[in-house]
């Protein structure tokens, strides 16, 4: 996969942030290294998985992979749950509503979104109660076997220069940037109000 070090670092920071959040809930993030279709079937058995949930991807190659994994899981008697959560609206639903044509102008996109109605309200923040009786099989070899890799481990064949203008990844970083942007907007609104 041809991905820049900046993008890899953003993704890795996001994974580390997610892992830190899960640690606070008594769990961990498991980064599975390798092809999912090769590795997941053995993990289904090793971990006695009964339910698999994942974010559906809209890229054609990823859709094919997801279908194979869904079939493997269902053949193993595992319930499979797909939920769109990285966008306010399901991209596939929007595309179908547009007759399969991607809106090329913002006005056409806004019109399409208005037809969908308001997006669903966000779910509550995950807490320890929601984990219930779930257990996380964290072993002594977790970091080596399932830990978040370093940039050097992923990008072995490229120079590892990350731009100084790089935006950090992760939910905490995103919330900090959002708060800063809202403060700037509020400050601008205050200045405009005083000048009128």
Predicted feature residues:
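Trp/Phe/Arg-rich N-terminal binding region typifying the photolyase-homology
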Residues: 1-128
